Every structure is written in structure tokens, then in C-alpha cells.
């Protein structure tokens, strides 16, 4: 999509504390780092809103191996997303400490009708760049749960 596709709805997606939680490692899933239950909640949101997923997580830092091949991190995330009919549309180009700046820079290139951020943390630049009002804060204890669904839908469809 390009700068002029203003009908796009975007979910800026963190992984840790959103698609997994502090309890995830204790479970016996295909990929213990990721929780299918959190993915099922994300699927509900995407099905209702038609939003695309833009990765903001530090997991994107090793998205590709040094030789340009797909990393295990990318493989795990995409595999699990694909199980729910989802995929990553794009990712931001920032360092972890300036995650909000990465979101704003992405939006400057890819206009969106609406957007929200799914993250379990509030980064300092979220407040500086007024991203907090677009944030749906998850809990690292549980990740993305049904309790978040209506808030995300409201921010995207509002």
C-alpha cells in the first residue's frame, strides 16, 4: 500500500506481553514463546476491523539472518499468525528505545484512516509524541485478552 491509501486501519503490534505472557513458557505449545490464545483474540480484532499488522516489537531486530534469510523469530511469528489467517504487513524501522518515533515515521510514509498500538509498555516517547491516546495497554501477566477487544475496535472504527 502507498502513502495515499487512507482507508487502511493499522495495528502497531508488540509481541512480548501481547502475543505471549509471563505464563506462556509454562505451557506446552508448538512455540513456547507464543500463546495461540492471544493470537485468537488478535484474529477477532482483525476480522472485525480489517486492520493490517505492523510489527513494532524488538523481535523485528532479528527479523532476517545476516545472510538475508528468514530468521527463526520471523518464522515462528508468521507461522503462528498464519494459523489464524493473519500476517505481518510491515514493520517499523526504529530502535527499541524510540518505538514511538518509529510509529510516527511509518505513518508519515503510509497514511492510515485509523490506527492503534497494542503494547504492554508505555515508552517515554509514547507520551512525548501523544501516542498514549492510541495505546491499548495489555498486561505482561496475560497478554492480549478479550478484555481488550472492544477498546481496540473502538480506536480503529471509532
Residue ranges and their predicted role:
Residues 2-50:
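Active-site neighborhood of HAD-like aspartate-dependent phosphohydrolases
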Residues 75-158:
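C-terminal cap/substrate-recognition subdomain and adjoining C-terminal extension
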Residues 46-69:
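Substrate-recognition element of Asp-dependent hydrolases with the DxDx(T/V) motif
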Residues 20-21, 62-66, 124-127, 145:
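Short catalytic/ligand-binding loop motif for oxyanion handling, primarily in non-cytosolic enzymes
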Residues 13, 56-59, 118-120:
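Short His-Asn-centered micro-motif
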Residues 26-33, 63-72:
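Short, flexible/disordered intra-domain loops and linkers
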Residues 24-25, 47, 67-68, 128-130:
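Short amphipathic alpha-helical segments
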Residues 10, 52, 114-116:
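Structural motif
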Amino acid at each position: 500500500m502507498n502513502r495515499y491509501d487512507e482507508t487502511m486501519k493499522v495495528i502497531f503490534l508488540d509481541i512480548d506481553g501481547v502475543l505471549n505472557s509471563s505464563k506462556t513458557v509454562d505451557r506446552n505449545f508448538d512455540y513456547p514463546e507464543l500463546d495461540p490464545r492471544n493470537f485468537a483474540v488478535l484474529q477477532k480484532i482483525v476480522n472485525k476491523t480489517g486492520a493490517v499488522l505492523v510489527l513494532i516489537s524488538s523481535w523485528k531486530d532479528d527479523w532476517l539472518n545476516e545472510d538475508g534469510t528468514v530468521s527463526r523469530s520471523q518464522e515462528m511469528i508468521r507461522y503462528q499468525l498464519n494459523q489464524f489467517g493473519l500476517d505481518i504487513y510491515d514493520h517499523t524501522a526504529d530502535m527499541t528505545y524510540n518505538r514511538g518515533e518509529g510509529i510516527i515515521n511509518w505513518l508519515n510514509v503510509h497514511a492510515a484512516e485509523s490506527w492503534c498500538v497494542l503494547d504492554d509498555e508505555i515508552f517515554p516517547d509514547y507520551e512525548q509524541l501523544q501516542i498514549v491516546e492510541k495505546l491499548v495497554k495489555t498486561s505482561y501477566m496475560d497478554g492480549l485478552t478479550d478484555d481488550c477487544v472492544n477498546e481496540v475496535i473502538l480506536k480503529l472504527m471509532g
